Amino acid sequence: MVRVMLVRFGFLLLMISFVFLSNNTLGQQQDDDDDSAVYIVTLKQPPIVHLFEEQELKHKKSKFTPKLRPRNNSRKRHGKSKIPSVVQSHDSFLRKTLKGEKYIKLYSYHYLINGFALFINSQQAEKLSMRKEVANIVLDYSVRTATTYTPQFMGLPQGAWVKEGGFEIAGEGVIIGFIDTGIDPNHPSFNDNDSKRSYPIPKHFSGVCEVTPDFPSGSCNKKLIGARHFAQSAVTRGIFNSSEDYASPFDGDGHGTHTASVAAGNHGVPVIVSNHNFGYASGIAPRAFISVYKALYKSFGGFAADVVAAIDQAAQDGVDILSLSITPNRKPPGVATFFNPIDMALLSAVKAGIFVVQAAGNTGPAPKTMSSFSPWIFTVGASSHDRVYSNSLTLGNNVTIPGMGFAIPTDSGKMYKMISAFHALNNSTSVDKDMYVGECQDYENFDQDRVSGKLLICSYSARFVLGLSTIKQALDVAKNLSATGVIFYIDPYVLGFEINPTPMDMPGIIIPSVEDSKTLLKYYNSSIQRDVTTKEIVSFGAVAAIEGGLNANFSNRAPKVMYYSARGPDPEDNSFNDADVLKPNLVAPGNSIWGAWSSASTDSTEFEGEKFAMMSGTSMAAPHVAGVAALIKQSYPQFTPSTISSALSTTALLNDNKGSPIMAQRTYSNPDQSLYTATPSDMGSGFVNATAALDPGLVFDTSFEDYISFLCGINGSDTVVFNYTGFRCPANNTPVSGFDLNLPSITVSTLSGTQTFQRSMRNIAGNETYNVGWSPPYGVSMKVSPTQFSIAMGENQVLSVTLTVTKNSSSSSFGRIGLFGNTGHIVNIPVTVIAKIASS
């Protein structure tokens, strides 16, 4: 039986060292009828990180104490000196197993997982799978990518930055690693030209900067301290385009440059787009170090084998935090979603002390759309903030239509006639010849005399979202036709896509609402005068004025959970059974975020050639949290990943800037017209609160051994746990569910009868007395003990929570436990339950 798992979900996170060894050249890859492919092979011997001696804090104690038996129980600490022997053992193993055969080894994985990536055929894969040393063979799979003002919205200038000593040192000494599309090293957001304070030398970092023609010597500096690229899987497949994708850490896409600047970009960088200053940018942790591991590319996305190599290298280099704005196309198959090369490698990264942040995914708002699964990964959803660049269109009938677009206004006090692109065609053009003429992409389709001096109405279709048509091209057409401005109305088929404000170098507006677009067209059509006999158009009577959208206002109710942000419950498997784990962990600003942009990016034509771009998605939310995590790590260097996670979660905000409960968008059609009170399935613990996270009061600790116990509690997981981690599940192991983990939340997918859950908390603040309050989920009675306790610094307190089913619930219901300290600390614990009364 061939032990080969076919896996095709499109996100991956793991780490490896870059070792390219080939027994033949790429020209010898395969014949036309060959079935060769890239496989990720993991071996049963543990990676280097599992050989490390545990260095736990004296006060740290695992809640669970299973009798775990690693294959190698050596207490000796292993470091870089171990790497050559691991790589040599891989080569020796392959030579013996595939003696005389052609194959390409792309990478050796050794730090977080023990294995390699190979380009082989199916017969060779089967031969490898029969070897007792092999744990898993997985087909390589594709992966994809998933501020000026947000630091102010998050309260950093008056809060967290003040606690750190000011923005001048916020995040200093902490290294954030980014697995993304690379970086533009010449961007001012990443220079080290701080004349007042030089950057310290990171003593715990061993990474390097690649030197290539497009990433020359000197690209890195005292802030950007590491940069590598990983593309061997793509190269082996023959799809790597070096002129477009750049065989270097240089960012040809823009996404990686953007995310890095959101987390750790320099403070006070002017955001100038289309010659207009939109403010001054800053990362959340502007003094943090940046190390870049490029594994995604503009033309094809990325592949698991390359991403795995990037993460393994990042861990080996010594990063403190990993930010991953990438998500899967589908849920991992197998026993549980947690058992995939990515999450297993990230579990090893957490064991090594790395805090891992991942985007939730942009597949909301339906339930169970979560793309980040495991409890050791901190999952971030996307929310709005209160800044809005308002633009509007005032019609001749005194109706005002809201819209968007970074555009200048039409002349004050003056109305201009409008003309639809379909009515502006020249005599040689028709819709029959070009069905896309309404998108205003070709100057030669139009009659300049008809358009000159008017507002040209164009259709914004799905082709704009796909990059087949562009705002920039439509504006160029309008200028060549001497139009006064451009109005874009939305095509109904664009529903479900987030549209960001776009720079316009003339008066213009995008109307993102279908209903508002209908209002515009109804007025326009009703104002057309026709000849009574011939029905030919005599004149266009509709007039309008564009207000312009260059100025921001800050009156928006925020935050709101964005409709596209992936939702819980967390799916445990491909049958969509619920895991007893809260996802997302929280939400952070992700909508309409200014960030640095690569000088070579053509990913967004509207921002091509600009130094900044506005983007939306959970990709933008995750680096906000990575930056806050860097601030926490700076204040508490001894904090483990789970402690950082706890500090972020228990301090999250539940109310918006108006003092009301945070709302969530329910649908992508007119999302702000379908708001409802956000639940933990939408926003996790709430909205990130950077200032409070630096002083959480009580923290919840969860160890690597706890996570292993959790994995061992999954039915049929014994062999998988052993193959991935090297730990054997005890024969008499008491099952541990997600709700048993010492997490700052309680999530029960099926609650029947009465169950009691315990949470252990450690006080990292001064002596304090806490009062405990709670609100039970629907269909459940709740009792929490103790209702009051006093605790000294360094002491632990166990909280006992008893839930009893009183009514059936067909879906998740939500409650909350609040701990209120007499010195001001507040600890929030969300409770999510599906209650089931057992049938008699």
Curated annotation (Swiss-Prot):
Homology family: Belongs to the peptidase S8 family.
EC number: 3.4.21.-
Location of this chain's protein in the cell: Secreted
UniProt record, GO biological process: proteolysis
GO cellular component terms, A-Z: extracellular region
GO terms for MF: serine-type endopeptidase activity
UniProtKB keywords: Autocatalytic cleavage, Glycoprotein, Hydrolase, Protease, Secreted, Serine protease, Signal, Zymogen
Biased composition (Basic residues): 61-81
Propeptide section residues: 28-146
PANTHER family noted in UniProt: PROPROTEIN CONVERTASE SUBTILISIN/KEXIN
Segments forming domain PA: 418-513
Top-rank taxon: Eukaryota
Official protein name in the record: Subtilisin-like protease SBT2.3
Pfam family, one: Inhibitor_I9
Residues listed as glycosylation sites in the UniProt record: N72, N193, N241, N398, N427, N480, N525, N553, N689, N715, N723, N767, N808
Renumbered residue ranges of the record's region Disordered: 61-85
Start and end residues of each Peptidase S8 domain: 148-694
Native species: Arabidopsis thaliana
CDD domains: PA_subtilisin_like (cd02120), Peptidases_S8_3 (cd04852)
Main location: secreted
This protein's encoding gene: SBT2.3
InterPro entries in UniProt: Peptidase_S8/S53_dom (IPR000209), Peptidase_S8/S53_dom_sf (IPR036852), Peptidase_S8_Asp-AS (IPR023827), Peptidase_S8_Ser-AS (IPR023828), Peptidase_S8_subtilisin-rel (IPR015500), Peptidases_S8_3 (IPR034197), S8pro/Inhibitor_I9 (IPR010259), S8pro/Inhibitor_I9_sf (IPR037045)
Disulphide-bonded residues: none
